[in-house]
Amino acid sequence: MLYTGTEAAHAWHGRSPISSALFEIRPSNLSIQAEPLFDSGLDAIIGYRTESGGVTYVYDLDGECVSVTERPLETPLIDPVDAIFLIGSVWRSGARVMARIGGYGAHAIISRSVLSGLRTRFAASSSKQLRFAATPLAHMQEPWRFVPVHILRLAIRHGKRIPDPKGHRGIFQYTAPMTHRGIRYQLDVVVRESDYTVLHFVYKR
């Protein structure tokens, strides 16, 4: 960890070198059966879905329930008006075809209003800009080091917080379990909290 704690802060405006959907920090209160909701427009997991006794529950990335709906007695596989969001699949407009994306659970749908709510919560979680020192900013362009910004934010919100291992005041390290390509890692994020700047991040097994 090469940082002094006084590094200049930079905004990241780059493009993700790999898909953000390959990363996940799952809320600790969700069951292992909860299916990730993949939004192809945002290229990210933006929530989770569980079903029990014909009732569907949808959760945001913080594990808060945002929707409870009861399945009708009879329903089509896809409703072209409301059912516009698929779990683990891609919707081809007008073609009524679903193409599977590996590793994201069974085909399923949620309503337009629930999708809008999840996207709103996803955007709201990024209202405070996360900045980077020069070295971690460079890592954001490297496929083998990159971690999506929203995943770093989740680690900061829900990870274990300890004082900076190097002893700098006002700096803290957050540690959270993270899954990448289906493999479990530990994600460490070191943050200067006065200006919300990432000084170091790394994931390891």
Where are these regions (language model features)?
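Ribonuclease/tRNase effector modules and their secretory precursors
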Residues: 1-205
